Amino acid sequence: MILKDLFTDISGFAEFVPGIDSNTNLSLLNSHAVTAYKRIANIVSVPVYNNIIKKGAGELYDHLRTALANLTMANDTVFDVLRKRKANIDIYKSEQEAIRRAYYENYYNAMDSL
């Protein structure tokens, strides 16, 4: 599981993404994390990605965690809206787009730092 390489639990994941629902779990997000991993590893290369994880705690590690978490959440935004609608929680399209943009901005900032 991609997320387990960088995060031990959802609270660790939540440190890097704003506004995450506390009912979310890492396994629910993993399919989006696979896509995020592929995009990030394609940019920085798989060996560099793995070296950052191997080195562990540090500035690059935090940038990688921020990038992966925010891109994962950006990819999950549409499905999060569906889950909320099933729970009878309305969300406006403009809110959804603002949330997605914020996640992408955080992702791009982290990738620039990497």
Spell out what each predicted region is.
Residues M1-R65, F79-L114:
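Conserved short "hinge" loops at termini or chain/domain junctions
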Residues L68:
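Catalytic-loop motifs flanking and including active-site residues across diverse enzymes
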